[in-house]
């Protein structure tokens, strides 16, 4: 009998893919987003060799030499439009965040029972479910995310912990949530006439 040939094992090298820290796309695709300038700056600071490959003078001139004059002009106009749109959207988002209030409401349920309701966290980039779980652990109470009658998600924490919640939010999420945007409200339940 003949010898059976053993299959040769090849060591495959894993490719390291670089993703942009601004738009989360590979750097080759950053030009198609609206944040091309910011992406270029990020790439220059963090991955110099990839930056040289994509944005060096010779790389840019070789790419431009294949385009006609009218296509170059159109590409420049499109890039300017995208940049302006991205800047406008970013400004609008920052303005919306600055104006958005986080409301911490103390609501009376029964005679001496209270719940604390927190709304408006999602505007500042916080996940309601995650924050609700952290609040439940921190204050050792029940905490859940519910939809209000208006259709907005709110966090309901059992007990009168509104001032403690305010302090905790500033301590943990102080960077995302400025103190001027937190509002304490006391809401008493109306007595039903029977």
From Swiss-Prot:
The keyword Ribosomal protein applies. It comes from Aspergillus clavatus (strain ATCC 1007 / CBS 513.65 / DSM 816 / NCTC 3887 / NRRL 1 / QM 1276 / 107). One of its GO terms (molecular function) is mRNA binding. This is Translation machinery-associated protein 22. The SUI1 domain may be involved in RNA binding. GO terms for biological process: formation of translation preinitiation complex; nuclear-transcribed mRNA catabolic process, nonsense-mediated decay; ribosome disassembly; translation reinitiation. Its main location: cytoplasm. GO terms for cellular component: cytoplasm; ribonucleoprotein complex; ribosome. The keyword Ribosomal protein applies. Belongs to the DENR family. InterPro entries: DENR/SUI1_TIF, DENR_C, DENR_N, SUI1, SUI1_dom_sf.
């Amino acid at each position: 009998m003949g010898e059976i040939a053993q299959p040769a094992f090849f060591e495959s090298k894993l490719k390291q893919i670089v993703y942009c820290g601004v738009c989360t796309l590979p750097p080759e695709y950053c030009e198609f987003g609206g944040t091309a300038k910011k992406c270029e700056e990020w790439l220059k600071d963090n991955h110099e060799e990839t930056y040289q490959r994509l944005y060096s003078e010779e790389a840019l001139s070789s790419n431009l030499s294949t385009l006609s004059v009218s296509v170059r002009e159109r590409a420049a106009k499109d890039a300017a439009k995208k940049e302006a749109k991205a800047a406008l959207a970013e400004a609008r988002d920052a303005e919306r965040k600055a104006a958005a209030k986080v409301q911490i409401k103390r609501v009376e349920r029964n005679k001496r029972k209270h719940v604390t309701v927190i709304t408006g966290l999602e505007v500042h980039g916080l996940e309601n479910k995650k924050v609700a779980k952290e609040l439940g652990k921190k204050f050792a109470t029940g905490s859940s995310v519910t939809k209000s009658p208006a259709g907005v998600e709110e966090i309901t924490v059992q007990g009168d912990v509104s001032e403690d919640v305010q302090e905790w939010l500033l301590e943990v999420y102080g960077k995302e949530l400025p103190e001027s945007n937190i509002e304490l409200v006391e809401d008493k339940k109306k007595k039903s006439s029977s």
